[in-house]
Amino acid sequence: MLDAFSRAVVSADSKGATIGSAELSSLRKYVADANKRIDATLAITQNVSCIAADAISGMVCENTGLTQPGGHCYPTRRMAACLRDGEIILRYVSYALLAGDPSVLDDRCINGLKETYIALGVPLSNAIRAIEIMKIATVAIMTETNSGRKMFEGINSGSGAECKDIASEAASYFDRVIDALN
């Protein structure tokens, strides 16, 4: 995983050139958005357990057979595994968001996820639904559209309304995970 600065240096070095004005402009934007990235990542990390638990609960409410004997969230150790997986996905989304680079998500989370779930007999449609719910909740927290909670009040980045671009980026990382499972 390379941050924006490392990527610019590696790219310029591979070309045997100095860092160009387009790259510097991109780095300026990255620096300008740094507080928003930190605050958005904080929004995820402070709410990771709730986001994952709500997503798994939502998935189960939509398919109550999951918690019945023979269901994929029965017994409780399977439910715990679902919660753990949700938290892991959120963790890697937060890493990608902070770095502004999805490679850590691709390399350490997405790579082999579908094959692992298939091997374990996890219904991909249920996993995808849980990730969709996590995406919706995360974006709502970042943009402060979740039942009035003011995540960014008094924080450097301003308001959640000012973080829509970062929330959109976070949503794209969830979409990467969903696409990998399709």
From Swiss-Prot:
Entry's Gene Ontology BP terms: photosynthesis
Record note on modification: Contains one covalently linked phycoerythrobilin chromophore.
UniProt superkingdom: Bacteria
Alphabetical list of Pfam families matching this protein: Phycobilisome
Residue numbers binding (2R,3E)-phycoerythrobilin: C82
Alphabetized InterPro entries for the sequence: Globin-like_sf (IPR009050), Phycobilisome_asu/bsu (IPR012128), Phycobilisome_asu/bsu_sf (IPR038719)
Gene Ontology CC: one annotated term: phycobilisome
UniProt keywords, alphabetically: Bile pigment, Chromophore
Quaternary structure (record): Homodimer.
Function comment: Green-light absorbing phycoerythrin of unknown function.
Protein family according to the UniProt entry: Belongs to the phycobiliprotein family.
Miscellaneous remark of the record: Prochlorococcus does not possess phycobilisomes, instead it uses a divinyl-chlorophyll antenna complex for light harvesting.
Protein name: R-phycoerythrin subunit beta
